[in-house]
Amino acid sequence: MEVNKASLTYDVPEDREYATKRILSLKRPSKIMVIGDVDTGKTTLIVYLANELISRGFKVAIVDADVGQKGILPPATISLALADMKFSSLSELKPLIHYFVGSITPSQFFGEMIVGTMRLSEIGKKFADYVLIDTTGMIYGSGVELKRLKIEAVKPDLILALEKKEELNPIVSGFEDKTIKLKVSENARSYSRSERRQIRQEKWRKYFENAKIVSFSLENVVVTGTSLFQGSDIREEEKSLLERLFKWVILHGRRIGDKYFVVKADVAEVPRVVDKNVVRYFDFEKLSNLLVGLLNEEGLCLGVGIIKGINFGEKRIDILTPVSEIENVREIRFGRIRVREDGEELGILDREAL
């Protein structure tokens, strides 16, 4: 299967020329956000516009915020790349930096989606004349509010809305003065959920193909995105009581406020009734192959990794990652998707699970 859904084409609707002229009329540097449903050609439009601007001698920055169908690797992040030469696909661009989201869907991660897009677009303005912002196809339900909040935060100078039947009106209402509605190209192809997963699997595989296992001391990095190290250690008598009550082996436990949070393994298959208002628990085996972001001192993501082992007693974590600037890692942020290095996705965890 073709790994890149979008590539450069000049077989485009006539309104693309008008959109290009509007972009050229903007005061530089400027930010242009592209929105639309899934399979409406958002990334194809980004590639086309970038090449048109580059051919006129302008520097272009691209913010790839389509976390589930990334052109700029890896998935589950928002990425910034700079382009000063013509290209055919986003996959050809070398990322400058990422913002870690930790999931392949925006659901439950609105904060990361908005902050990441805002931060990277502002960085892009420092290096380029135009910042082109690609987005997810989440435009219904809570997706309306996500897009509106993103527009409020990012403050794009122009919004390009790819729509078929005014489905984007709830999003662009109030922003009409800086919105251009564009036709969806007749050449836009639809992809099934299975095809999207296969494409993403190949992208994961490619990203991790030269990865190595790196061991980190949990005392030398900040750990975020999880409750694992919040609060204080549970006492030995509390641990023993919980183990007897629920037939668990507790490998790690914390007291967070008036609640317990434990990492456990079952020692027997028995029915359990656990009041989650008192005890939150997480299966130790689900930490294996969990995606994490490796962040620098500015909270920006150098790349991602997969947990291959964690020793709570020795306070060490082993992570498979292609990131080479390990000395710049200051923070490890836990994500909510489990994935193997061969690209096979093992499932998405709820935001509150960890």
UniProtKB/Swiss-Prot annotation:
Question: Which reaction is recorded as catalysed by this protein?
Answer: a 5'-end dephospho-2'-deoxyribonucleoside-DNA + ATP = a 5'-end 5'-phospho-2'-deoxyribonucleoside-DNA + ADP + H(+); a 5'-end dephospho-ribonucleoside-RNA + ATP = a 5'-end 5'-phospho-ribonucleoside-RNA + ADP + H(+)
Instruction: Name the Enzyme Commission number(s) assigned to this protein.
Output: 2.7.1.78
* InterPro entries noted in UniProt: Clp1/Grc3, CLP1_P, P-loop_NTPase
Instruction: State the top-level EC class.
Output: transferase
| Essential cofactor(s) | a divalent metal cation
Q: Name one GO molecular function term.
A: ATP-dependent polydeoxyribonucleotide 5'-hydroxyl-kinase activity
- Keyword Transferase among UniProt keywords: yes
Q: What are the recorded Gene Ontology BP terms?
A: RNA processing
Q: Which Gene3D superfamilies does the record cross-reference, listed alphabetically?
A: P-loop containing nucleotide triphosphate hydrolases
Residues annotated for ATP binding in this entry: 36-43
Keyword annotations for this protein, in alphabetical order, are: ATP-binding, Kinase, Nucleotide-binding, Transferase
Pfam families attached here?
Answer: CLP1_P
The cross-references to PANTHER family, in alphabetical order and at most eight, read: CLEAVAGE/POLYADENYLATION FACTOR IA SUBUNIT CLP1P, POLYNUCLEOTIDE 5'-HYDROXYL-KINASE NOL9
Purpose of the protein: Polynucleotide kinase that can phosphorylate the 5'-hydroxyl groups of both single-stranded RNA (ssRNA) and single-stranded DNA (ssDNA). Exhibits a strong preference for ssRNA.
What name appears for this protein in its UniProt entry? Polyribonucleotide 5'-hydroxyl-kinase PF0112
Give the organism the record lists.
Pyrococcus furiosus (strain ATCC 43587 / DSM 3638 / JCM 8422 / Vc1)
